[in-house]
Amino acid sequence: MKLYYHYDQEADVLYFSQGKPSAKDQSEEAKNDTILRIDPKTGKVNGFTILNFARRLQRGMTSVSLPIEAHLTQGL
């Protein structure tokens, strides 16, 4: 499955998805201005949104801790 990301500079938001985002996904607010996108059928996290992304970098934050566990595999 492909990984997609998009940064909206005007809104200062980073969007990250495993596969194409779906309108059926449910959003759940996590901590630190992070929103998780969850598949309602499987309960698995399909992506996340990080608010105030550039501001974090300007404040010297070089990493963002996400409240999810990821298992990535390489497709052939």
What are these regions (language model features)?
Residues 2, 32-35:
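Short loop/turn microsegments at loop-to-beta-strand junctions
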Residues 8-9, 39-40:
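Short, acidic, Ser/Thr-enriched surface-loop or helix-capping motifs
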Residues 16-21:
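N-terminal intrinsically disordered, cationic/polar leader segments
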Residues 22, 52-55:
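A short acidic/small-residue loop/turn micro-motif
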Residues 26-30:
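Short loop/turn motifs at secondary-structure junctions and domain boundaries
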Residues 55-66:
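A short, polar/charged loop-to-alpha-helix boundary motif
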